Amino acid sequence: MPKVKTHSGAKKRFALTAKGKIKRKHAFKNHMLDKKQTKQKRRLTHTALVHKSDKSRIEKLLRI
């Protein structure tokens, strides 16, 4: 039986923390940034954690 592969899109978008939580980046910080407030852009810069309701789905994609 062949090895199960990690989802290519998921491995580019998510990262694990030392405690096993899953980090993600915020959306809406790619283009048309002149229309967005400085406060909003600063808030979107920082990484966030994946919500617990989505965690199991992401773990399946990452094969954790």
UniProtKB/Swiss-Prot annotation:
Cellular component aspect of the GO annotation: cytosolic large ribosomal subunit
Keyword Ribosomal protein among UniProt keywords: yes
Tagged with keyword Ribosomal protein: yes
GO BP terms, alphabetized: translation
InterPro entries: Ribosomal_bL35, Ribosomal_bL35-like, Ribosomal_bL35_CS, Ribosomal_bL35_sf
Keywords: Ribonucleoprotein, Ribosomal protein
GO-annotated molecular function: structural constituent of ribosome
Pfam families membership: Ribosomal_L35p
PROSITE patterns: RIBOSOMAL_L35
Highest taxon, organism lineage: Bacteria
NCBIfam families named among the record's database cross-references: rpmI_bact
Recorded family membership: Belongs to the bacterial ribosomal protein bL35 family.
Record's protein name: Large ribosomal subunit protein bL35
Species in which this protein is naturally found: Amoebophilus asiaticus (strain 5a2)
